[in-house]
Amino acid sequence: MRHVDAGSCNGCEHELSAASGPHYDLARFGLSVTASPRHADVLLVTGPVTVHMRDALLAAYEAMPEPRIVAALGNCALGRGVLGSPDNLAGPLEKLLPVTVRIPGCPPTPEQIIQGLEPLLHRSARQGASKVRGLEDPSALR
């Protein structure tokens, strides 16, 4: 996964960090965050897309190998947030990129993040994505 903060308040990043920590451990589900979009099959976007982050976000998407999966994490990425004014925003994420997975919340909990990513893990495996593996035991979250 490549995470791009497109202009958030960092609430979603805090929860994503918790989901990656030892208690939830995203890695046990085959998920890891990579520094380069060239090594990612999931683009995880947080925050509303600001004017200043638009080009960087689109460049990250273009650098990803096929199949490209975009996940919107949090209400701001879904166009329902309270940050910014229309003049500061490039538009809703869904108008800029094809969003596959929507994970609502302000911010979503680590459990919601993992459960929200579960469907795309199975889809990714069916499409032959190489880096994301299926969630073997979703009940492990409970």
Predicted regions and their residues:
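Iron-sulfur-associated redox domains of electron-transfer enzymes in respiratory
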Residues: R2-R142
